[in-house]
Swiss-Prot record:
Organism, scientific name: Prochlorococcus marinus (strain SARG / CCMP1375 / SS120)
One Pfam short name: Ribosomal_L19
Record family assignment: Belongs to the bacterial ribosomal protein bL19 family.
Any Gene Ontology CC annotation: cytosolic large ribosomal subunit
PROSITE patterns reported in the protein's UniProt record: RIBOSOMAL_L19
Protein name per its UniProtKB record: Large ribosomal subunit protein bL19
PANTHER family, A to Z: LARGE RIBOSOMAL SUBUNIT PROTEIN BL19M (PTHR15680:SF9), RIBOSOMAL PROTEIN L19 (PTHR15680)
Region (Disordered): 1-44
Length: 160
């Protein structure tokens, strides 16, 4: 009976061969896989879109918040000339994120409220400069549309 047990258990040499063969198998599979390179890596559609959007975003966009008074430089082309026209007002809304991020800027021009929606990463937006920080407790300031005169002012924030 002891001889049967001895015959069924592998000898030291056989066990070393088994260990070496089991070690060799994963290495062989690792070597056959292609190296990770940008040209050969296959991305999912969602990852590909995210990568494209990231490449199209502007690098230096200031951190703006709802309630801030900003000056947006808008590129205007007249004929073959191009100039930058400033548009200053209060941000009353921010929407979306990433490449499609928009801000709605409101100002009073000749007694009439004018709102413009700017895509932050658009080539038509030359610059965004924060003139003063606003202290508000709402994500959207649509209530400013109903206010007139001094009631449309936003308190200034000094900590940002």
């Amino acid at each position: 009976m002891t001889e049967d047990l001895k015959n069924t258990s592998p000898s030291k040499e056989e066990s070393n061969e088994i260990e070496e063969s089991s070690k060799a198998t994963p290495k062989a599979t690792r070597e056959t896989k292609p190296k990770d390179s940008p040209s050969k890596t296959k991305l999912s559609a969602q990852a590909l879109i995210a990568q494209f959007e990231k490449s199209q975003q502007k690098k230096k966009v200031p951190e703006v918040y709802v309630g801030d008074t900003v000056r947006v430089g808008v590129r205007i082309s007249e004929g073959n000339k191009e100039r930058v026209q400033p548009y200053e007002g209060v941000i009353i809304a921010k929407r979306h994120g990433g490449l499609n991020q928009t801000i709605t800027v409101r100002r009073i021009f000749q007694g009439v409220g004018v709102e413009r929606v700017f895509m932050v990463h658009s080539p038509q937006v030359a610059s965004i400069k924060v003139e003063r920080r606003g202290k508000v407790r709402r994500a959207k300031l649509f209530y400013l549309r109903d206010r007139v005169g001094k009631a449309t002012r936003v308190k200034q924030r000094f900590d940002r």
